[in-house]
Protein backbone atom coordinates (compact mmCIF):
# COMPACT_ATOMS: atom_id res chain seq x y z
CA UNK A 1 0.00 0.00 0.00
CA UNK A 2 1.18 3.50 -0.75
CA UNK A 3 1.93 5.64 2.30
CA UNK A 4 -0.36 8.57 2.86
CA UNK A 5 -3.54 6.90 1.46
CA UNK A 6 -6.40 6.92 3.91
CA UNK A 7 -8.92 5.20 1.65
CA UNK A 8 -9.36 3.38 -1.64
CA UNK A 9 -11.71 4.58 -4.38
CA UNK A 10 -13.52 1.94 -6.40
CA UNK A 11 -15.27 2.58 -9.68
CA UNK A 12 -18.99 1.98 -9.37
CA UNK A 13 -21.07 0.46 -12.16
CA UNK A 14 -24.75 -0.28 -12.52
CA UNK A 15 -26.49 -3.09 -14.41
CA UNK A 16 -28.06 -0.95 -17.13
CA UNK A 17 -27.42 -2.39 -20.62
CA UNK A 18 -26.21 1.03 -21.78
CA UNK A 19 -23.79 1.46 -18.88
CA UNK A 20 -20.00 1.59 -19.04
CA UNK A 21 -19.80 -1.87 -17.48
CA UNK A 22 -21.41 -3.47 -20.52
CA UNK A 23 -19.68 -1.27 -23.08
CA UNK A 24 -16.25 -2.42 -21.86
CA UNK A 25 -17.00 -6.15 -22.09
CA UNK A 26 -15.31 -7.60 -25.18
CA UNK A 27 -17.81 -10.44 -25.64
CA UNK A 28 -15.11 -13.00 -26.34
CA UNK A 29 -15.75 -16.74 -26.09
CA UNK A 30 -19.41 -16.24 -26.92
CA UNK A 31 -21.69 -16.55 -29.92
CA UNK A 32 -23.77 -13.45 -30.57
CA UNK A 33 -26.66 -13.12 -33.00
CA UNK A 34 -28.92 -10.28 -34.08
CA UNK A 35 -32.50 -11.05 -35.04
CA UNK A 36 -33.89 -8.90 -37.85
CA UNK A 37 -37.24 -8.80 -39.61
CA UNK A 38 -38.30 -8.17 -43.19
CA UNK A 39 -39.49 -4.74 -42.05
CA UNK A 40 -35.96 -3.89 -40.90
CA UNK A 41 -34.48 -4.87 -44.27
CA UNK A 42 -37.10 -2.70 -45.99
CA UNK A 43 -36.12 0.20 -43.72
CA UNK A 44 -32.47 -0.35 -44.69
CA UNK A 45 -33.31 -0.27 -48.40
CA UNK A 46 -35.41 2.89 -48.02
CA UNK A 47 -33.00 4.57 -45.54
CA UNK A 48 -35.69 4.94 -42.88
CA UNK A 49 -35.50 5.35 -39.11
CA UNK A 50 -35.63 2.24 -36.95
CA UNK A 51 -36.71 2.17 -33.31
CA UNK A 52 -35.29 -0.20 -30.70
CA UNK A 53 -37.33 -1.46 -27.74
CA UNK A 54 -36.56 -3.26 -24.53
CA UNK A 55 -38.19 -6.70 -24.56
CA UNK A 56 -39.69 -5.96 -21.16
CA UNK A 57 -41.27 -2.80 -22.59
CA UNK A 58 -42.82 -4.76 -25.45
CA UNK A 59 -44.35 -7.23 -23.00
CA UNK A 60 -45.58 -4.47 -20.70
CA UNK A 61 -47.10 -2.43 -23.54
CA UNK A 62 -49.04 -5.48 -24.76
CA UNK A 63 -50.36 -6.11 -21.26
CA UNK A 64 -51.39 -2.46 -20.94
CA UNK A 65 -52.78 -2.30 -24.50
CA UNK A 66 -50.67 0.68 -25.58
CA UNK A 67 -47.91 1.56 -28.03
CA UNK A 68 -44.43 0.66 -26.75
CA UNK A 69 -41.91 3.41 -25.97
CA UNK A 70 -38.67 3.20 -27.93
CA UNK A 71 -35.41 3.20 -25.98
CA UNK A 72 -33.49 4.44 -29.03
CA UNK A 73 -34.18 5.46 -32.64
CA UNK A 74 -31.53 5.49 -35.36
CA UNK A 75 -31.11 5.12 -39.10
CA UNK A 76 -31.65 1.52 -40.16
CA UNK A 77 -28.89 1.78 -42.75
CA UNK A 78 -26.37 2.96 -40.12
CA UNK A 79 -27.25 0.05 -37.83
CA UNK A 80 -26.92 -2.33 -40.78
CA UNK A 81 -23.45 -0.96 -41.53
CA UNK A 82 -22.41 -1.46 -37.90
CA UNK A 83 -23.63 -5.06 -37.99
CA UNK A 84 -21.82 -5.73 -41.26
CA UNK A 85 -18.55 -4.20 -40.03
CA UNK A 86 -18.64 -6.12 -36.75
CA UNK A 87 -19.27 -9.39 -38.61
CA UNK A 88 -16.39 -8.65 -40.97
CA UNK A 89 -14.02 -7.69 -38.16
CA UNK A 90 -14.86 -10.39 -35.63
CA UNK A 91 -17.22 -12.94 -37.25
CA UNK A 92 -19.97 -11.76 -34.89
CA UNK A 93 -22.85 -11.11 -34.80
CA UNK A 94 -24.59 -13.75 -36.84
CA UNK A 95 -27.93 -12.86 -38.41
CA UNK A 96 -31.24 -14.54 -37.66
CA UNK A 97 -33.92 -13.54 -40.16
CA UNK A 98 -36.92 -13.55 -37.84
CA UNK A 99 -39.66 -13.26 -40.49
CA UNK A 100 -38.26 -16.10 -42.60
CA UNK A 101 -37.62 -18.30 -39.55
CA UNK A 102 -41.24 -18.04 -38.43
CA UNK A 103 -42.62 -18.58 -41.93
CA UNK A 104 -40.86 -21.98 -41.83
CA UNK A 105 -42.04 -22.68 -38.25
CA UNK A 106 -43.64 -26.15 -37.99
CA UNK A 107 -45.48 -25.54 -34.70
CA UNK A 108 -46.66 -21.94 -34.98
CA UNK A 109 -49.92 -22.64 -33.12
CA UNK A 110 -47.92 -22.95 -29.90
CA UNK A 111 -46.15 -19.62 -30.34
CA UNK A 112 -43.41 -17.89 -32.33
CA UNK A 113 -39.74 -18.82 -32.52
CA UNK A 114 -37.98 -16.06 -30.60
CA UNK A 115 -34.52 -17.46 -29.98
CA UNK A 116 -32.02 -20.22 -30.65
CA UNK A 117 -29.22 -22.06 -28.92
CA UNK A 118 -25.86 -20.18 -28.96
CA UNK A 119 -24.74 -21.65 -32.30
CA UNK A 120 -28.16 -21.06 -33.92
CA UNK A 121 -28.66 -24.57 -35.31
CA UNK A 122 -31.64 -25.19 -33.01
CA UNK A 123 -34.56 -22.79 -33.31
CA UNK A 124 -37.89 -23.59 -31.73
CA UNK A 125 -40.37 -22.60 -29.04
CA UNK A 126 -39.34 -21.02 -25.75
CA UNK A 127 -38.30 -23.45 -23.01
CA UNK A 128 -37.68 -26.40 -25.29
CA UNK A 129 -34.51 -28.44 -25.67
CA UNK A 130 -32.93 -30.59 -28.35
CA UNK A 131 -30.17 -33.20 -28.31
CA UNK A 132 -27.77 -32.72 -31.23
CA UNK A 133 -25.78 -35.16 -33.36
CA UNK A 134 -23.60 -34.68 -36.44
CA UNK A 135 -22.56 -37.10 -39.17
CA UNK A 136 -18.98 -36.86 -40.47
CA UNK A 137 -19.42 -36.46 -44.24
CA UNK A 138 -15.89 -37.66 -44.97
CA UNK A 139 -16.83 -41.11 -43.62
CA UNK A 140 -19.48 -41.41 -46.35
CA UNK A 141 -17.17 -40.63 -49.25
CA UNK A 142 -16.67 -43.55 -51.66
CA UNK A 143 -13.59 -44.41 -53.74
CA UNK A 144 -14.72 -41.98 -56.46
CA UNK A 145 -14.89 -39.08 -54.01
CA UNK A 146 -18.69 -39.06 -54.17
CA UNK A 147 -21.14 -39.25 -51.29
CA UNK A 148 -22.31 -42.82 -50.68
CA UNK A 149 -25.96 -41.84 -50.64
CA UNK A 150 -27.45 -45.13 -49.44
CA UNK A 151 -25.01 -45.40 -46.52
CA UNK A 152 -25.71 -41.78 -45.67
CA UNK A 153 -29.48 -42.32 -45.73
CA UNK A 154 -29.09 -45.42 -43.56
CA UNK A 155 -27.05 -43.48 -40.99
CA UNK A 156 -29.60 -40.65 -41.00
CA UNK A 157 -32.40 -43.14 -40.29
CA UNK A 158 -30.45 -44.79 -37.46
CA UNK A 159 -29.50 -41.51 -35.83
CA UNK A 160 -33.04 -40.18 -36.07
CA UNK A 161 -34.10 -43.22 -34.05
CA UNK A 162 -31.20 -42.74 -31.60
CA UNK A 163 -32.14 -39.08 -31.05
CA UNK A 164 -35.77 -40.03 -30.53
CA UNK A 165 -34.69 -42.48 -27.83
CA UNK A 166 -32.49 -39.79 -26.29
CA UNK A 167 -35.56 -37.66 -25.54
CA UNK A 168 -36.58 -40.26 -22.96
CA UNK A 169 -33.07 -40.60 -21.55
CA UNK A 170 -32.11 -36.92 -21.38
CA UNK A 171 -31.89 -34.83 -18.23
CA UNK A 172 -33.41 -31.35 -18.39
CA UNK A 173 -32.65 -28.21 -16.36
CA UNK A 174 -36.28 -27.52 -15.43
CA UNK A 175 -39.66 -29.22 -15.25
CA UNK A 176 -41.14 -26.98 -17.96
CA UNK A 177 -38.31 -27.70 -20.41
CA UNK A 178 -38.70 -31.42 -19.74
CA UNK A 179 -42.47 -31.30 -20.31
CA UNK A 180 -42.21 -29.33 -23.56
CA UNK A 181 -39.42 -31.57 -24.83
CA UNK A 182 -41.72 -34.56 -24.36
CA UNK A 183 -44.57 -32.59 -25.95
CA UNK A 184 -42.66 -31.83 -29.18
CA UNK A 185 -39.82 -34.40 -29.17
CA UNK A 186 -37.44 -32.17 -31.13
CA UNK A 187 -34.45 -33.89 -32.76
CA UNK A 188 -31.27 -32.16 -33.93
CA UNK A 189 -29.43 -34.06 -36.65
CA UNK A 190 -26.79 -32.38 -38.80
CA UNK A 191 -23.53 -33.06 -40.58
CA UNK A 192 -19.92 -31.96 -40.11
CA UNK A 193 -16.66 -31.77 -42.08
CA UNK A 194 -18.24 -30.26 -45.20
CA UNK A 195 -15.11 -28.18 -45.82
CA UNK A 196 -12.83 -31.23 -45.85
CA UNK A 197 -15.31 -33.17 -47.99
CA UNK A 198 -15.13 -30.41 -50.60
CA UNK A 199 -11.39 -29.84 -50.26
CA UNK A 200 -10.38 -33.45 -50.96
CA UNK A 201 -12.41 -33.22 -54.17
CA UNK A 202 -10.75 -29.96 -55.21
CA UNK A 203 -13.98 -27.96 -54.93
CA UNK A 204 -13.64 -24.34 -53.68
CA UNK A 205 -15.68 -23.76 -50.54
CA UNK A 206 -17.10 -20.47 -51.84
CA UNK A 207 -18.32 -21.69 -55.24
CA UNK A 208 -21.60 -22.42 -56.98
CA UNK A 209 -20.78 -26.13 -57.05
CA UNK A 210 -20.03 -26.22 -53.32
CA UNK A 211 -23.32 -24.51 -52.52
CA UNK A 212 -25.20 -26.90 -54.80
CA UNK A 213 -23.59 -29.92 -53.12
CA UNK A 214 -24.33 -28.52 -49.66
CA UNK A 215 -27.97 -27.88 -50.58
CA UNK A 216 -28.42 -31.38 -52.02
CA UNK A 217 -26.81 -33.14 -49.04
CA UNK A 218 -28.93 -31.09 -46.65
CA UNK A 219 -32.06 -31.98 -48.61
CA UNK A 220 -31.23 -35.72 -48.52
CA UNK A 221 -30.53 -35.62 -44.78
CA UNK A 222 -33.57 -33.51 -43.99
CA UNK A 223 -36.16 -35.54 -45.83
CA UNK A 224 -34.59 -38.89 -44.84
CA UNK A 225 -34.94 -37.81 -41.20
CA UNK A 226 -38.57 -36.81 -41.78
CA UNK A 227 -39.21 -40.18 -43.45
CA UNK A 228 -37.77 -41.99 -40.41
CA UNK A 229 -39.86 -39.78 -38.13
CA UNK A 230 -43.01 -40.62 -40.10
CA UNK A 231 -42.09 -44.31 -39.93
CA UNK A 232 -41.86 -44.14 -36.13
CA UNK A 233 -45.08 -42.13 -35.93
CA UNK A 234 -46.92 -44.80 -37.93
CA UNK A 235 -46.06 -47.31 -35.19
CA UNK A 236 -46.02 -45.17 -32.05
CA UNK A 237 -48.17 -42.19 -33.00
CA UNK A 238 -46.98 -38.61 -33.66
CA UNK A 239 -45.58 -36.31 -30.99
CA UNK A 240 -48.31 -34.94 -28.67
CA UNK A 241 -48.22 -31.42 -30.15
CA UNK A 242 -48.63 -32.62 -33.75
CA UNK A 243 -52.40 -32.64 -34.22
CA UNK A 244 -52.95 -28.98 -33.35
CA UNK A 245 -49.96 -28.00 -35.54
CA UNK A 246 -50.71 -30.44 -38.36
CA UNK A 247 -51.71 -27.86 -40.98
CA UNK A 248 -48.62 -25.71 -40.42
CA UNK A 249 -46.25 -28.65 -40.37
CA UNK A 250 -47.60 -30.11 -43.61
CA UNK A 251 -47.41 -26.67 -45.23
CA UNK A 252 -43.71 -26.41 -44.32
CA UNK A 253 -43.05 -29.92 -45.65
CA UNK A 254 -44.79 -29.08 -48.92
CA UNK A 255 -42.60 -26.00 -49.27
CA UNK A 256 -39.47 -28.10 -48.68
CA UNK A 257 -40.59 -30.46 -51.44
CA UNK A 258 -41.21 -27.56 -53.81
CA UNK A 259 -37.69 -26.25 -53.19
CA UNK A 260 -36.21 -29.68 -53.94
CA UNK A 261 -38.13 -29.89 -57.22
CA UNK A 262 -37.50 -26.26 -58.23
CA UNK A 263 -41.15 -25.23 -58.15
CA UNK A 264 -42.17 -21.79 -59.39
CA UNK A 265 -42.49 -18.97 -56.85
CA UNK A 266 -46.27 -18.88 -57.10
CA UNK A 267 -46.55 -22.46 -55.82
CA UNK A 268 -45.10 -21.73 -52.36
CA UNK A 269 -47.45 -21.29 -49.40
CA UNK A 270 -47.11 -18.49 -46.86
CA UNK A 271 -43.60 -17.36 -47.77
CA UNK A 272 -42.59 -13.73 -48.29
CA UNK A 273 -39.10 -14.62 -49.54
CA UNK A 274 -38.88 -17.76 -51.66
CA UNK A 275 -36.04 -20.23 -51.01
CA UNK A 276 -33.15 -20.84 -53.38
CA UNK A 277 -33.95 -24.18 -55.02
CA UNK A 278 -31.47 -26.97 -55.72
CA UNK A 279 -29.01 -25.74 -58.37
CA UNK A 280 -29.36 -28.39 -61.08
CA UNK A 281 -26.68 -26.77 -63.23
CA UNK A 282 -23.90 -27.20 -60.66
CA UNK A 283 -25.18 -30.12 -58.59
CA UNK A 284 -23.54 -33.53 -59.30
CA UNK A 285 -26.01 -35.87 -61.09
CA UNK A 286 -26.01 -38.55 -58.37
CA UNK A 287 -26.99 -36.00 -55.71
CA UNK A 288 -29.56 -34.37 -57.96
CA UNK A 289 -31.24 -37.70 -58.68
CA UNK A 290 -31.29 -38.65 -55.00
Predicted regions and their residues:
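Short, contiguous, pocket-lining structural segments
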Residues: 151, 186-190, 221
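Core structural elements
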Residues: 160-166, 180-202
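Short helix-capping/linker segments at secondary-structure and domain boundaries
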Residues: 138-144, 199-206
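Short secondary-structure subsegments characteristic of cysteine-rich extracellular domains
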Residues: 208-226
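Ubiquitous "structural anchor" signal
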Residues: 99, 196-198, 203, 210, ...
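Active-site cavity-forming subdomains of large catalytic enzyme subunits
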Residues: 1-157, 168-180, 214, 225-290
Amino acid sequence: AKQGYTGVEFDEYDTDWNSEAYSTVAGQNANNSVRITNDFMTAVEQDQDWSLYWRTELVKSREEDREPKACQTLRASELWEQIAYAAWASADPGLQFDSTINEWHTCEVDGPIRASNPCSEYMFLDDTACNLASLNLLRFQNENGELDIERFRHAVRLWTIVLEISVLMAQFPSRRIAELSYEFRTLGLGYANLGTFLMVNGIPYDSEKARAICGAITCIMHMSAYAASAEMASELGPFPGYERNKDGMLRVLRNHRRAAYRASDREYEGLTIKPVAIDSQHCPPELLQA
